[in-house]
Amino acid sequence: MARYLGPKLKLSRREGTDLFLKSGVRAIDSKCKIEQPPGQHGARKPRLSDYGVQLREKQKVRRIYGVLERQFRNYYKEAARLKGNTGENLLQLLEGRLDNVVYRMGFGATRAESRQLVSHKAIMVNGRVVNIASYQVTPNDVVSIREKAKKQSRVRASLELAEQREKPTWLEVDAAKMEGVFKRIPERTDLSADINEHLIVELYSK
């Protein structure tokens, strides 16, 4: 499947937010103004239509979680099929992805790095190696780092970095053992207020 391999900062500038969490890993060059649109002089943002606003929000969320368009649409279809609020269901499905859980637990500094740990077979779920980033973690699942991967400096550095972040209440992590428990599905109030999932629902409902 196709995956964007271009400059990630360019996408962050397009969406006006740090999509790939780079600022939490290293200082971003002062010349690279995230709040300024791409282009040498930061082209002025055009006034967006309702559709444009909805599309931008969908693209932002899709890029935050590192999901391709077809896969994102499938997540939406599944969210709409489930009982409850479709937008909230969508975010919960994205939060339940193994690569995201690995990031939330602090084993990877970014979701991209966490996805790499999963694909390189460094992650176990309930004692079994899982190398599928989209694997859905469910309540009470135990996610851990494989023994041979525990020595990786990037994993230790990520855990140190995670100490500076707010700890998710729906997870329980033992940094010394490099393992964590997915205690429950996060509620909407647990997640970022910077995401407007209602715009995505409006977009796909057309």
From Swiss-Prot:
Biological process (GO), any one: ribosomal small subunit biogenesis
Domain of life (superkingdom): Bacteria
GO cellular component term of the entry, any: small ribosomal subunit
GO molecular function: rRNA binding; structural constituent of ribosome
Span of domain S4 RNA-binding: 96-157
UniProt KW rRNA-binding keyword: yes
Keywords, comma-separated and alphabetical: Ribonucleoprotein, Ribosomal protein, RNA-binding, rRNA-binding
Record-linked SUPFAM superfamilies: Alpha-L RNA-binding motif (SSF55174)
NCBIfam families in alphabetical order: PRK05327.1, rpsD_bact
Purpose: One of the primary rRNA binding proteins, it binds directly to 16S rRNA where it nucleates assembly of the body of the 30S subunit.
Family designation: Belongs to the universal ribosomal protein uS4 family.
Subunit structure: Part of the 30S ribosomal subunit. Contacts protein S5. The interaction surface between S4 and S5 is involved in control of translational fidelity.
Protein name: Small ribosomal subunit protein uS4
Gene responsible for this protein: rpsD
